[in-house]
């Protein structure tokens, strides 16, 4: 099992393996993805703050791109954006609203993920994901070559 699958496999599956926006009912997938990374960073280093630059690096984004997205999350009440004056850096924290909604979504994802594994089987599910990734990569390459 990949490291990514070990921690919150149901969230990882729906965020990275099975990209279906309809799974999410209270939070948009794009928002949930950022919130998920904030949560993972908080859980992996609970004694430290989640600095925007570190989060951007973990997500493979530019700080300016992530900054815009985090601003929208703050407007929706999902994060609190603060400044660490001592470190001279900005950091984010999940709001209680985000924690609550993510918990609801996670329960639903757990249910769906378990049912998929039970009815389709672990191996078939992995093969399906691999096929979907291959198809997506082909489409991406075609998009790049045709402009």
Describe every region a protein language model picked out.
Residues 49-58:
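A short alpha-helical element within helix-turn-helix/winged-helix DNA-binding domains
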Residues 71-126:
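Charged, amphipathic alpha-helical coiled-coil/dimerization segments
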Residues 52, 70-71:
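Short, hydrophobic-biased segments on the C-terminal half of alpha helices
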Residues 1-30, 36, 76:
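N-terminal leader segment of winged-helix/HTH proteins
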Residues 32, 64:
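Key DNA-contact positions within bacterial/archaeal DNA-binding proteins
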Residues 36-43, 106:
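Short, locally clustered residues in the helix-turn-helix/winged-helix DNA-binding domain
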Residues 1-6, 123-147:
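C-terminal regulatory/oligomerization modules of transcriptional regulators
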């Amino acid at each position: 099992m990949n490291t990514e699958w070990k921690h919150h496999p149901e969230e990882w599956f729906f965020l990275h393996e099975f990209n279906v926006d309809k799974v999410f009912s209270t939070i948009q997938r794009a928002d949930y993805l950022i919130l998920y990374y904030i949560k993972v960073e908080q859980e992996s280093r609970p004694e430290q703050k989640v600095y925007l630059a570190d989060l951007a690096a973990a997500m493979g984004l530019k700080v300016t791109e992530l900054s815009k997205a985090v601003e929208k999350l703050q407007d929706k009440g999902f994060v609190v954006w603060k400044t660490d004056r001592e470190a001279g850096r900005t950091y984010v924290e999940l709001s209680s609203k985000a924690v609550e909604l993510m918990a609801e979504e996670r329960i639903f994802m757990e249910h769906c993920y378990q049912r998929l594994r039970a009815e389709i089987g672990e191996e078939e599910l992995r093969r399906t994901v691999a096929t979907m990734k291959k198809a997506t990569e082909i489409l991406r390459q075609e998009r790049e070559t045709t402009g």
